């Protein structure tokens, strides 16, 4: 059996809180992590886990100030922010006529209290997994910001990280909640959140430049011509993303096989030469990865994996993020060879189960920690669970429309409610709709003042994302804002450093400073772009 490298092994002490802040009974365990943060666990079988999860990176907080009163039946914990009242060993779910009977947490000096199952209707939301096929509305996930002054995050069903660094399923009977009770101190709530989940990594400086992607069948020579066109038109480019056609395909039908891990040698006969060519020109290379179809026998490293798994009949090896042996082979034989070839960015385009997506993002990011001479990162759909940890988020294949563009500034500002900065949207929209020079220009202008600036569109000559493909007026304006984006990179990188060290998002909604204007439509699409 293949083992994961040492960089995967977690520090188990990070998952254990001081005994001074833990209160437990046969079926419950309550932990006071900070003056504003509680961990609430209930399990009818009495089992409680200290393993870290895809959400939680640390529970070893400094011991906060609090007061506890308890007897055989009741537990009451008070801090400067809240008072918890609990009937010991009772289910967190109270009776229908009094849902807060068993467990209630009250914000001090307010009329507001939380109980398990509460709707939290005043939550300001924090984003979605993707905006694929956006039609003017989308179901938004809960954020941290709430005019109630509290929010609960449920960690019950998230994957756990065992002592080897592999992922395992959680106990299906457990309830494992994190309750933030912060009143109006949202900045301190974010600090607690990042202490719990991990502070954001500092993204590479190149990621703040201009990205290019088009869903077309590029060859190595095609990409060189593309870069020459950017240079000829005096438009900077920092990242080249290749869609699924970079990898081995069925030669009779290029639309088959969304999954692949080996370069198509007909298009890229020398992958290392291709990445070197780009790196010498200051351009980083990203590849589209969707592992959902498994590992086919045509892959360069198939035999290494199949031999280890004792597979002899050439069948496709299914992808299983919970199979530690398979995932260790996946890392060793599918991720690492691409890193060795000079690939900088892995565009995780997995569209199914969010828990699996979380696991995929975990394995890639953890593997990157052993890389010394490069700073690889992932571009991923949001797994919703602590998405700030996983690099840069990709909002999916958005429609070409004014409705989409109108929604995106509001969507950017929502991200801060979940501690997220690095959202990436398709400049111009990705698919459908009607191409319009005015719409294109407005997208470019918006993207200049967005976290990530990424041109992207599906196949077909109909979609013009190259600024030089438009009329001279559109081209001139688009180039002007591309150059402005380039000049903004030092400012953006300073803000990226502040985000990584201090947890201060690049984009913040106006209502953080002026909460009374939240419902004013004139301000809905406005946000602060950095501290200045």
Identify what each model region corresponds to.
Residues 192, 196, 226-229, 233, ...:
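Generic, well-ordered alpha-helical scaffold segments in large soluble proteins
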Residues 201-354, 388-389:
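Aromatic-lined carbohydrate-binding/catalytic grooves of carbohydrate-active enzymes
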Residues 2-24, 31, 229, 233-234, ...:
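Carbohydrate-binding surfaces of carbohydrate-active enzymes
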Residues 211-213, 242, 283-296, 348-352, ...:
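Aromatic-lined carbohydrate-recognition surfaces of secreted/lumenal glycan-active proteins
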Residues 8, 33-72:
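A low-complexity, Ser/Thr/Gly/Pro-enriched, surface-exposed linker/loop concept
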Residues 62, 68-207, 213-215, 220-222, ...:
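Catalytic and substrate-binding clefts that recognize carbohydrates or anionic sugar/phosphate headgroups
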Residues 300-333, 339, 363-469, 501, ...:
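Glycan-recognition surfaces
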Residues 29, 37-38, 74-76, 83, ...:
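Beta-sheet entry/capping signal
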């Amino acid at each position: 059996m293949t083992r994961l490298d040492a960089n995967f092994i977690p520090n188990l002490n990070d998952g254990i809180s001081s005994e001074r802040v833990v209160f437990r009974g046969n079926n419950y365990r309550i932990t006071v992590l900070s003056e504003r943060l509680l961990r609430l666990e209930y399990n009818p079988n009495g089992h409680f886990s200290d393993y870290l999860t895809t959400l939680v990176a640390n529970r070893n907080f400094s011991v906060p100030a609090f007061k506890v009163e308890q007897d055989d039946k009741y537990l009451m914990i008070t801090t400067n922010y809240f008072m918890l009242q609990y009937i010991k060993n009772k289910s967190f779910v109270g009776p229908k006529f009094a849902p807060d009977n068993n467990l209630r947490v009250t914000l001090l000096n307010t009329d507001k209290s939380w109980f398990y199952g509460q709707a939290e209707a005043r939550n300001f939301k924090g984003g979605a997994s993707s905006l694929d096929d956006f039609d003017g509305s989308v179901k938004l996930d809960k954020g941290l910001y709430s005019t109630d002054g509290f929010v609960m995050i449920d960690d019950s069903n998230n994957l756990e990280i065992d002592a080897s660094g592999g992922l395992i399923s959680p106990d299906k009977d457990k309830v494992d909640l994190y309750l933030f009770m912060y009143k109006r101190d949202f900045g301190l709530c974010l600090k607690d959140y990042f202490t719990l989940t991990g502070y954001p990594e500092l993204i590479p400086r190149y990621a703040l430049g201009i990205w290019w992607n088009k869903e077309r069948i590029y060859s190595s020579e095609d990409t060189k011509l593309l870069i020459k066109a950017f240079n000829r038109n005096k438009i900077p480019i920092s990242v080249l993303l290749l869609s699924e056609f970079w990898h081995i395909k069925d030669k009779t039908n290029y639309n088959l096989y969304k999954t692949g891990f080996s370069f198509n040698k007909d298009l890229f006969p020398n992958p290392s030469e291709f990445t070197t060519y780009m790196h010498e020109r200051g351009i980083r290379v990203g590849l589209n990865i969707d592992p959902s179809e498994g590992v086919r026998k045509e892959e360069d490293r198939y035999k290494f994996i199949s031999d280890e798994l004792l597979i002899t009949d050439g069948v496709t090896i299914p992808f299983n993020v919970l199979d530690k042996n398979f995932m260790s082979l996946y890392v060793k034989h599918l991720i690492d060879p691409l890193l060795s070839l000079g690939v900088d960015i892995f565009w995780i385009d997995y569209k199914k189960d969010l828990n699996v997506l979380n696991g995929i993002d975990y394995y890639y990011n953890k593997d990157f920690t052993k890389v010394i001479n490069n700073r690889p990162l992932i571009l991923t759909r949001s797994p919703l669970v602590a998405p700030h940890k996983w690099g840069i988020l990709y909002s999916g294949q958005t429609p070409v429309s004014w409705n989409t563009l109108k929604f995106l500034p509001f969507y950017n500002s929502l991200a801060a409610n979940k501690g997220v900065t690095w959202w990436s949207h398709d400049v111009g929209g990705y698919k459908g709709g009607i191409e319009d020079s005015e719409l294109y220009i407005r997208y470019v202008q918006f993207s200049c003042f967005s976290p990530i600036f990424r041109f992207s569109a599906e196949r077909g000559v109909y979609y013009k994302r190259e600024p030089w493909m438009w009329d001279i007026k559109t081209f001139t304006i688009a180039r002007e804002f591309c150059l402005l984006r380039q000049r903004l990179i030092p400012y953006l990188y300073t803000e990226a450093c502040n985000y990584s060290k201090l947890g201060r998002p690049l984009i913040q909604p106006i209502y953080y400073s002026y909460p009374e204007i939240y419902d004013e439509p004139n301000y809905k699409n406005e946000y602060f772009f950095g501290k200045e």
